[in-house]
């Protein structure tokens, strides 16, 4: 996630939110730490309102996106710990008339196939699942053979698969707030 924060920063984003999975999972803890490390490295202020934990489904991703966009200074970019949660942002953007990759940038993690078919295609990080499977199989074989097996704590760097869901912001947080206010008035 540190690399994702750096990417968004290089595109011009300064208000970057993070939608995390259940913090009890090791991967979620590591992704949160990466997000926070990225903010710190770039001198961006950490805002607790810009971090939501416990988001596991597309519907929860949708709700989290709505909550973040209702902040007085909404994020121009949102990182998601999982692609499944990120896909919920697409419905919200459509409902509010926002163009993903322009008024709202999204980067997530997992590389699920559905992300490639989203409109625009999701920008995502993923790991080499073949290598991860080989590591797990080697551990299982050791275990079956009665060898002592340490817990697998090895992590490999994720690879960015650029889609079109992230781009330079076309509006500031303040301008985005005004757009969202207008969208709310039109909907009622």
Task: Provide a role label for each language-model segment.
Residues 1-3, 19-64, 79-87, 109-111, ...:
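Hinge/beta->alpha junction and helix N-cap segments in small-molecule ligand-binding domains
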Residues 6:
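Carboxylate-rich, polar loop motifs that coordinate divalent cations or form catalytic acidic clusters
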Residues 9, 40, 94:
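Short polybasic/polar patches that bind polyanions
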Residues 9-12, 69:
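Non-catalytic positions within long, well-ordered alpha-helices that form the structural scaffold/packing
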Residues 13, 32, 119:
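ATP/adenylate-binding site constellation spanning eukaryotic-like Ser/Thr protein kinases
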Residues 13-19:
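Short hydrophobic beta-strand segments
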Residues 14, 45-47, 99:
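Conserved H-loop
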Residues 64-187:
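Flexible loop/turn connectors
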């Amino acid at each position: 996630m540190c690399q994702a924060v750096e990417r968004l920063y290089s595109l011009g984003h300064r208000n970057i939110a993070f939608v995390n999975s259940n913090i009890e999972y090791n991967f979620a803890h590591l992704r949160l730490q990466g997000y926070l490390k990225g903010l710190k490295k770039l001198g961006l202020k950490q805002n607790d309102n810009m971090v939501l934990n416990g988001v596991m489904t597309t519907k929860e991703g949708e709700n989290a996106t709505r909550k973040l966009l209702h902040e007085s200074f909404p994020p121009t970019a949102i990182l998601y710990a999982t692609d499944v949660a990120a896909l919920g942002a697409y419905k919200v953007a459509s409902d509010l008339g926002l163009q993903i990759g322009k008024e709202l940038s999204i980067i997530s993690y997992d590389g699920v196939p559905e992300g490639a078919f989203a409109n625009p295609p999701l920008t995502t990080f993923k790991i080499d699942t073949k290598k991860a499977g080989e590591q797990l199989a080697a551990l299982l074989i050791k275990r079956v053979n009665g060898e002592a097996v340490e817990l697998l704590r090895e992590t490999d760097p994720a690879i960015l698969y650029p889609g079109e869901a992230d781009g330079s912001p076309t509006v500031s947080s303040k301008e985005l707030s005004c757009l969202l206010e207008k969208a709310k008035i039109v909907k009622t």
